[in-house]
Structure formats: structure tokens, C-alpha cells
């Protein structure tokens, strides 16, 4: 009976290893390739666009297979991991040429979305966080820990509820979360809805080498979740983790808190529409020059400060850098030459660092004395702490300078990595190699002269070693018996001589010894650097902080931001405030600034005005101003006085949660409820059009109730925009509410947005005018105008002589009267066709009615630009 293809020793070995990693693609090393078999091959060929073939094609049970070259494997692994898959890398643990029987193979690493460390250059400013969560049944709290294996960062927190877990995980943009059996299945499903891979780690046991990482933790909840995280890391990585830093406990309430919906709505790091960084607040603020500075900026954006002393400390350092342009420019220039110290230290620990990495490390360290000199020149006390901690790690820089060749290759096992003069024995081997190769060159010249064959050459390959090659046309010129024939080619013959083979032995022996010694020396150097990883990580933190501060200074000067005054009272006073991102996109000249004035007696601004007039921008503008101020950055205004907020809640936009089947209205109510439940008098609440997702009266009733609840119970500073104009009467009964509106005027039937916030309620919503700006057909717009007039007339008929407070909604008629039927039919009458003015007539009419004395020069210029654009069309 023939043997099944799956019953060979190699395939039995494959299945044994695969069964240990059932949820991962197994990259199984065979020679120079990683092979995938069975379902891995079928699915992998589709995801990686590889040709699907088969092992033992002609057998009754051929095995599906595909493969990738080992030198290109990382790209394919990245593709799979980026799509949320795990990859188990199975290596040959012995040389197939010397192995007795089946080659021993082992999985040396399990690469997962949360543990991948080989980040591309475009991801250099992104952290890749692996998180862990468990539920402590005794305290009824959640343990939450995270690490970035590429940088060694390790942090832990105790969270009150699962919503807080979600907020932390989404804020970190984690791709993988490690759980145990304590977490409810429904919670795991929530992670999956957010495209977070859930990995199980039930057994918890960390090695003695890592136990020191938890020695500063006091809570059992913190200790257990960190151990859970580290156990998973140990199990999957199977590598040295010397660069992992001691676990640091943090308290989310020590920072300005924003739930994931608020961060999403405010587009802090990703645009809602495109998912890209460009057009976000992070994009605007990022003038960092180093990868670790870029990552720290994002961390500061995710967690602005709430302690006034810390905020002022950052502001003061930014002010110094704003005031010293030349020193700041020099600092930027030096930081540009600093590579990613955090990830270089990580590669040293992992043992994956190469010669080029060490040259980058040396180059970076050599910039630190120059950075110190710039700070010393500033001679400002606010930078004394930075100077104290900017350790240039000069001993490591000197070691690399003396040992590693500037042109070191990527490979660490093929030689040419250690400098001449670093090690005497290595120099001896190299001299032997160089003398031998000179002897080869001399022999080639000698043989050409002796034989008269000018094309004779001496070459080398790994199969035959050194050889003498002569073309067929010149074979007759070789003296009889001079060479020993070794290989026949199509157009040439290759020969050897005893003397050549002896010299080959000497050269190759020297080469092998040289290469082996170089690798040994490189490993010794790597171990010396590994002992200084903590110093390198501390230095990286100092450089990153300097980088973010100079970035704040650059954008503050470039966009004319001002240093905000942070107060302990609750008043907000912003003069000429701007939305910094919108201003950058539009250009400074065309942006209309706005004031925001909410004294201690004003808790709620009720905002009315047309669609597209800038209500949402005005609200986001305040949120971004608060976030920037509490990050320590300057803000987009001419003056700003702000309280320190503890939380920001937003409901802006109508992004349905389609994945979990929740409607716009349900999401709206949930997001509003978070503010009502968790908000305090120190919070900022931004509600845009609450209630629009349901019937008119329902929406209006809910909107009013929410406003009243905030006014009477929460007392948070609140911006509440609405189309329910009836709500503007609330200022009569709610003493801490103030009406404002976005100005707009009609000119010859056209709507002109002033984009200026004015006191009092808006008189109209101008919906049809906005539809006109959107390009809807004239016929439709005219019809809408007729319908609107009829509806307004009907509403007036019902309300004439009767006071209708917001709290008493007008009842709906249960029966239709003949008059009402006639009114409804009239809505569908064919309207008369309007006479449309020419662009020149429209401009002339607008110019005639313009009051130039009430306009600023900039407003006049903007109006002229609009007219010119219209006439050119």
C-alpha cells in the first residue's frame, strides 16, 4: 500500500508543530523558503497573492502548498499581521547538511498584531500597543495593562467599568488585547466589533528575569494583569526582553478624559471621512523631527494634563523656544540627525540589531552634546532639569566609533562589520585574506603573460572555489599539462592547479576565522550596549520631550498662537478664537475668528443659526483650544483665559454605529447620557443638534430636558446647538443659559454667511438657502419655498393669540378639516417660474445695498473676491 503524502516524517513534524499554533499561519522553513501547507496555503495564497501549488502533485492526496523566500518573508508576514492574523515562524535549528535524520525545527517567534516590532518608516511615529485586561471579582474593577514591545513602555491602570476599558483601548489604537476567563463573552465581542484581536492567556507565570518589572506595583489587580500581559509576551516572543521597562501605574482621572466617541468626533488623530492623519489636530501640531518625539506628541494629545503646575511648566518652556528663533532652529537641525533611540534599544535587547543600527545609534549619541550646548546657551532655568538628564552616553558612542565600520552591511554574520585596528587577531586574519587575494591577482597577471591569453581570468564560486577560466577560442594556447580540467561550460573551460587550491585553503580558512571572530566580537559589543539600555531609554525620553516642545513652539509662531492663561475659576474668555485646522486648510486671510465669552454665571451657550454657517466648527474650535492649552501648547486666538477641565464630552455629527446595529438616535442618546451621568462642573460638553434623530416633538422635548438637566444638576460648561428655535425661550427660565447665533443675511434672495457669532437667537434657519448653495435644482427650491410659506401660514393660524411655551407642545389635530385638505393640495400646485437675475445684476444689487461703513477692510476684500469669482464664471 503506497504511503500517504501526509504520512512522511517531515509532514508529521509539520502537523505536530501546527497543532500547537492552530490559530496562526505557520511559516515552515525548508531550505531558503518558508512553506505554507493545507488551509494555511489555500488562504495564504489568496491574501498574499501567491501561486497555490501542491506537494506530491501526482499523488492521490496532494497537499496544497505555497511559499515565500526567507529573505523576503518579513514583507509577507507584515501583510498578514496588518490584516489581524498571527504568524508562527518555524526555523531549522540545525544545518541540514550535517543533521542526522529529520532536521530539527522549532517556532522561534509568534508574530501577532500587538507584538510586531518591525515597523516601516511611515509607521515610525506610531506606537504599536499590546494590551491586556481582566476582571477582579473581589474589587469589581478591571485591570488594564499595555506595552509597546518596540520601545519597552509598560503601563497599568485600574478601571471602574468596561466603558473605561474600551476608551483606553481605543485611545491607544490597540490591535490586540489579551484576556483570561474572567471577561464576559459579550465584552470580547465588543473588542472584535472594534477590529481588536482577542487572544487568550489563562495561565499566568513570568520568568524570574522579568519579576523586577512588577516590584513597584502595590495592587494585586495591577500585578495580575501585568503578569498576564508579560506571560503572553514571553510565550509568543521567545526572545530577550531586557528593554521592557518597569511597570508604571497611571490613573486616567489625572488627565483630561475624553471617551472614544469624543476623540473620534473631534478628529484628533484620524479624519472621520478618510481615516487619515492629514487634516487632524495631530497633523497640525506635528513639527517633530524624531520618531520618539512624534509618538510622545500623540500620547500628550491623547492625555492632556489637568494639573496647573505641569501645564505651566510646559508653557514656559514653549515660550522660551518661541522667543529664541535661532536657538530653536539649531535645536531642530540637531534633532533631525537623531534616529529612533527607543526602538534601537529594543533591537539591541531582542538581539536583532545590526551594524547599520549601531552606526545610527552612534550618530544619534554624537548629537546630544550639541543639544546640551544649545540649552546651555539659552541659559533658562526652565531647561535645567533637561540638562541634568541629557546623558550623552559617551562611552557607548566611543565604543561604536572605535569598533563598527561606517559602511557595515545589514548582515551580522558575513563579515566586514568590525573596523581594522579594533582587534589584533582579526587584523591578522584579514592580512592573510588580503595577501592571499593579492597573490591571486598576481597569479592571474602571470598566467596571462605566460600563456598569452589576455582573457584568462581567475574566479571564485562556493561550489568549486577558485578556478582559472579560459574561453574555448583560446584552449589551444594552454601549454600541455599546465592545468587540471575542473568544469566545462558552453563557451569556456575551468581549470585548477595544486598551488591555486593550496592558496584557496589558506584564504578560505582565514575568511572563515575572520567572519566567525567578527560575529563573536559583534555579540560582545551588543552585550556591552545591552547593559546601558536603561540609560538609552532615559535619554530617548528627554529628547522626545524637547522635540515636542520645539514642535509646539514652531506651530505657535507659524500660526500666531498665544499663550493661554489658565485659571482656577470657571470663566472662559477667548478673543478672536479660530479652529486651528480649518484655518490652516483655508488660509489665514479667509478665516473669520470668533469670541467665546462664558463668565462664571454662564454655563450654557444655546447656539442657533443656518446649516453650514459654522456652528459645529465653533464648538469644535473650543474643544481643540482646551485640548491644546492643557497639552501645554499655545492656542489659536489673540487672547485666551481658560479654566482647567477634567473631561470633554461631545455629540457632533451623526455617525451610525452600523456594526453593532445601533441607529443614529440610539448612539446620540448613549453619548449624551455619558455626559449627563459622568460630567461635573469642571467638564466641557458639546452637543450638536441633539434630538434630530427622532420625531420633532420627541426631539424637542428631549433637547429641552437635557438642557435643563445640565443646568440644574451637572453645571458643566456646555455649547448646545439646535434647530429647535422654540428652545431659545429657555433663557427666560434658566439663568445660566445664554442665546447666541451665527450671523447670516439675505441679499436679493441669496444667503450670505457672516460666520460671526452674535448674541441672541437666530430669526430663521435658512434651510432652503443652504439647499441652494448645495446646487439643488431651481425648480425644486422654488417649490420648497411655496411649501414653506404654506406651512408657516398654517403654524401662524394655530398660534395667533395663544402663548405656546416650549414645555407645552401644540397638540396634533386628530381629524383633517376641509380647510386643511385644501392647504395640503395647494402645496402641490405648479409654481410660477421665477425670473432669474444675471450675475452682473446680482452683484450690482448687492453693491448698491452694501453699507461700507460697517465693514472692515478684510470683509470688503473678501466680498470683492466673491464678486470677482462670480463674474468670472
Swiss-Prot record:
Keyword Cytoplasm on entry: no
Biological processes, Gene Ontology terms: mismatch repair
Any one cellular-component term (Gene Ontology): cytosol
Pfam family, one: MutS_II
Region (Disordered): 797-817
UniProt superkingdom: Bacteria
Keywords carried by this UniProt record: ATP-binding, DNA damage, DNA repair, DNA-binding, Nucleotide-binding
InterPro entries: DNA_mismatch_repair_MutS, DNA_mismatch_repair_MutS-lik_N, DNA_mismatch_repair_MutS/MSH, DNA_mismatch_repair_MutS_C, DNA_mismatch_repair_MutS_clamp, DNA_mismatch_repair_MutS_core, DNA_mismatch_repair_MutS_N, DNA_mismatch_repair_MutS_sf
Chain sites annotated for binding ATP: 609-616
Matches recorded under PROSITE patterns: DNA_MISMATCH_REPAIR_2
Any one GO molecular-function label of the UniProt entry: mismatched DNA binding
HAMAP family: MutS (MF_00096)
NCBIfam families listed in its UniProt record: mutS1, PRK05399.1
Family label: Belongs to the DNA mismatch repair MutS family.
Physiological role: This protein is involved in the repair of mismatches in DNA. It is possible that it carries out the mismatch recognition step. This protein has a weak ATPase activity.
Protein name: DNA mismatch repair protein MutS
Source organism of the structure: Pediococcus pentosaceus (strain ATCC 25745 / CCUG 21536 / LMG 10740 / 183-1w)
Amino acid at each position: 500500500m503506497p504511503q500517504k503524502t501526509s504520512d512522511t516524517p517531515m509532514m508529521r513534524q509539520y502537523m505536530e508543530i501546527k497543532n500547537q499554533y492552530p490559530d496562526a499561519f505557520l511559516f515552515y522553513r525548508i531550505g531558503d523558503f518558508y512553506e505554507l501547507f493545507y488551509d494555511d496555503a489555500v488562504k495564504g495564497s489568496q491574501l498574499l497573492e501567491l501561486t497555490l501549488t501542491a506537494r506530491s502533485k501526482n499523488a492521490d492526496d496532494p497537499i496544497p502548498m505555497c511559499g515565500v523566500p526567507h529573505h523576503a518573508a518579513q514583507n509577507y508576514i507584515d501583510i498578514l499581521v496588518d490584516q489581524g492574523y498571527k504568524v508562527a515562524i518555524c526555523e531549522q535549528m540545525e544545518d541540514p547538511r550535517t543533521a542526522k535524520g529529520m532536521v530539527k525545527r522549532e517556532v522561534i517567534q509568534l508574530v501577532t498584531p500587538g507584538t510586531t516590532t518591525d515597523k516601516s518608516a511611515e509607521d515610525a511615529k506610531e506606537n504599536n500597543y499590546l494590551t491586556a485586561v481582566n476582571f477582579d471579582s473581589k474589587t469589581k474593577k478591571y485591570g488594564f495593562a499595555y506595552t509597546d514591545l518596540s520601545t519597552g513602555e509598560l503601563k497599568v491602570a485600574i478601571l471602574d467599568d468596561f466603558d473605561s476599558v474600551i476608551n483606553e483601548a481605543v485611545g491607544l489604537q490597540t490591535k490586540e488585547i489579551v484576556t483570561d476567563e474572567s471577561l464576559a463573552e459579550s465584552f470580547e465581542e465588543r473588542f472584535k466589533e472594534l477590529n481588536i484581536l482577542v487572544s487568550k492567556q489563562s495561565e499566568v507565570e513570568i520568568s524570574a528575569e522579568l519579576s523586577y518589572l512588577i516590584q513597584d506595583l502595590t495592587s494585586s489587580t495591577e500585578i495580575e494583569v501585568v503578569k498576564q500581559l508579560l506571560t503572553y509576551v514571553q510565550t509568543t516572543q521567545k526572545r530577550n526582553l531586557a528593554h521592557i521597562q518597569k511597570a508604571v501605574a497611571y490613573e486616567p482621572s489625572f488627565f483630561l478624559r475624553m471617551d472614544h466617541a469624543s476623540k473620534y468626533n473631534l478628529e484628533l488623530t484620524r479624519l472621520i471621512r478618510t481615516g487619515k492623519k492629514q487634516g487632524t489636530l495631530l497633523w497640525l501640531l506635528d513639527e517633530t523631527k524624531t520618531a520618539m518625539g512624534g509618538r510622545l506628541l500623540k500620547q500628550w494629545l491623547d492625555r492632556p494634563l489637568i494639573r496647573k503646575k505641569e501645564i505651566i511648566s510646559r508653557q514656559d518652556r514653549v515660550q522660551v523656544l518661541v522667543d529664541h528663533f535661532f536657538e530653536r532652529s539649531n535645536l531642530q537641525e540637531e534633532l533631525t540627525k537623531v534616529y529612533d533611540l527607543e526602538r534601537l534599544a529594543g533591537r539591541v535587547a531582542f538581539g536583532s540589531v545590526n551594524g547599520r543600527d549601531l552606526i545610527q545609534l552612534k550618530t544619534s549619541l554624537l548629537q546630544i552634546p550639541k543639544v546640551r550646548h544649545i540649552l546651555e546657551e539659552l541659559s533658562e532655568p526652565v531647561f535645567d532639569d533637561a540638562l541634568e538628564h541629557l546623558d550623552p552616553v559617551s562611552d557607548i558612542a566611543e565604543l561604536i566609533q572605535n569598533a563598527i565600520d561606517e559602511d557595515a552591511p545589514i548582515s551580522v554574520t558575513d563579515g566586514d562589520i568590525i573596523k581594522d585596528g579594533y582587534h589584533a587577531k582579526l587584523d591578522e586574519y584579514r592580512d592573510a585574506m588580503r595577501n592571499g587575494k593579492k597573490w591571486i591577482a598576481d597569479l592571474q597577471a602571470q598566467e596571462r603573460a605566460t600563456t598569452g591569453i589576455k582573457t584568462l581570468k581567475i574566479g571564485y564560486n562556493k561550489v568549486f572555489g577558485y578556478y582559472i577560466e579560459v574561453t574555448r577560442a583560446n584552449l589551444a594556447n594552454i601549454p600541455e599539462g599546465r592545468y587540471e580540467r575542473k568544469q566545462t561550460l558552453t563557451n569556456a573551460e575551468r581549470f585548477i592547479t595544486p598551488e591555486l587550491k593550496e592558496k584557496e585553503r589558506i584564504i578560505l580558512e582565514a575568511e572563515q576565522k575572520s567572519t566567525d571572530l567578527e560575529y563573536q566580537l559583534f555579540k560582545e559589543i551588543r552585550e556591552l550596549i545591552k547593559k546601558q539600555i536603561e540609560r538609552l531609554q532615559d535619554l530617548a525620553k528627554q529628547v522626545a520631550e524637547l522635540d515636542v516642545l520645539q514642535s509646539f513652539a514652531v506651530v505657535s509662531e507659524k500660526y500666531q498662537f498665544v499663550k493661554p492663561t489658565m485659571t482656577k475659576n470657571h470663566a472662559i474668555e477667548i478673543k478672536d478664537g479660530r479652529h486651528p485646522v480649518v484655518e490652516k486648510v483655508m488660509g489665514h486671510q479667509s478665516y473669520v475668528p470668533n469670541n467665546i465669552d462664558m463668565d462664571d454665571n454662564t454655563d450654557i451657550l444655546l447656539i442657533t443659526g443656518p446649516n453650514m454657517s459654522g456652528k459645529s466648527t465653533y464648538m469644535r474650535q473650543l474643544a481643540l483650544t482646551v485640548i491644546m492649552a492643557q497639552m501645554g501648547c499655545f492656542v489659536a486666538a489673540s487672547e485666551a483665559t481658560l479654566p482647567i477641565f477634567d473631561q470633554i464630552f461631545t455629540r457632533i455629527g451623526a455617525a451610525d454605529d452600523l456594526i453593532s446595529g445601533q441607529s443614529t438616535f440610539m448612539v446620540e442618546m448613549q453619548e449624551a447620557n455619558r455626559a449627563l451621568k459622568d460630567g461635573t462642573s469642571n467638564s466641557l460638553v458639546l452637543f450638536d443638534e441633539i434630538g434630530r434623530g427622532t420625531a420633532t416633538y420627541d426631539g424637542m422635548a428631549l433637547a429641552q430636558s437635557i438642557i435643563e438637566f445640565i443646568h440644574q444638576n451637572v453645571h458643566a460648561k456646555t455649547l448646545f446647538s439646535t434647530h429647535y428655535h422654540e428652545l431659545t425661550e429657555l433663557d427666560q427660565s434658566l439663568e445660566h443659559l445664554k442665546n447666541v447665533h451665527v450671523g447670516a443675511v439675505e441679499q436679493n434672495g441669496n444667503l450670505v454667511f457672516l460666520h460671526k457669532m452674535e448674541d441672541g437667537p437666530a430669526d430663521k434657519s435658512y434651510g432652503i438657502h443652504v439647499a441652494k448653495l448645495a446646487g439643488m435644482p431651481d425648480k425644486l427650491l422654488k417649490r420648497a419655498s411655496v411649501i414653506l410659506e404654506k406651512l408657516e401660514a398654517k403654524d401662524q393660524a394655530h398660534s395667533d393669540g395663544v402663548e405656546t411655551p416650549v414645555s407645552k407642545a401644540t397638540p396634533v389635530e386628530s381629524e383633517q378639516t376641509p380647510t386643511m385638505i385644501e392647504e395640503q393640495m395647494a402645496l402641490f400646485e405648479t409654481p410660477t417660474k421665477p425670473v432669474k437675475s444675471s450675475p452682473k445684476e446680482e452683484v450690482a444689487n448687492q453693491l448698491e445695498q452694501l453699507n461700507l461703513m460697517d465693514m472692515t477692510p478684510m470683509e470688503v476684500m473678501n466680498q470683492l473676491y466673491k464678486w470677482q469669482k462670480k463674474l468670472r464664471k
